[in-house]
Amino acid sequence: MKRQKRDKLTRAHSKGYQAGISGRSKDICPFQQNDARSEWLGGWREAVEDRHVGLSVK
């Protein structure tokens, strides 16, 4: 059975969240395309909010 590839925008959001929750800067966004960059930054913002609320991954 073939493993289905995840949507690139979903992956960008997930990677942004991972970067944000680990405390990295939003300036390290690896995406150049506006859609993917927007999703990455959205994930990053969500993670930063979660960190401020007290949720963290160690």
UniProtKB/Swiss-Prot annotation:
Subcellular location: Cytoplasm
One GO location term (cellular component): cytoplasm
Extent of Basic residues compositional bias: 1-14
Positions of the UniProt region annotated as Disordered: 1-25
InterPro entries linked: Ribosome_modulation_factor, RMF_sf
Predominant subcellular localization, coarse grouping: cytoplasm
UniProt keyword annotations, A-Z: Cytoplasm, Translation regulation
Any GO BP annotation: regulation of translation
Record HAMAP family: RMF
Family: Belongs to the ribosome modulation factor family.
Function: During stationary phase, converts 70S ribosomes to an inactive dimeric form (100S ribosomes).
Protein name: Ribosome modulation factor
